[in-house]
Amino acid sequence: MHLSNYLIKEKKIVVATHNKGKVEEFRVLFSKYKIQILTSEDLNISDVEETGKTFEENSIIKVKSIPNNYLAIADDSGLCVKILNQEPGIFSARYAKKCGGWNEAMKKIYSRVKTKQNPDYSAKFVSCLSLKFHDGKIFTYNGEIQGKITWPPKGNNGFGYDPFFIPVDETLTYGEVEYSKKVLTDHRSVAFKKLAKVHLKNN
């Protein structure tokens, strides 16, 4: 297999998601390469059931929902809290839905950690990107950012658990930091930079 056959040369890519926060991040990441973003919604493709046991498996399930006549990318990501055995992890979005929203989910996670005998607020954000070409070949790239959860959540930037998470060596949550900076330094961007190094080097 020659990686030169898997360079992104076209100027349009489908993001396999209905999550507007993710779509906006991908828009920023791909804007440098002047690549237009389409979404599952644009193609009238419903969200798929995430039956995988890992971020990578779910990311692949999502990207496979896009027909091969489109270049496609998918992200599966989540918050992993160390003392909670890496929960909510791959269930991050579903956990929030079950709790009645992101704020309720953050409140419950913080409460679960706080009531431990020796509370440890260490956490990480994880992202796995899957890139699928027209022949069905899929490449996956992972990104992680270590940090901690904090209470109360702060800031209105970003989405999901962003106001709840402070990266290592930082004092602001992802909800407080300037959005343009966050997008270029978060877990998704770590994975994207690995992808770009391989597939976008000629752009």
How should each PLM-predicted stretch be described?
Residues H2-V14, G21-N203:
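Anionic-ligand binding patches
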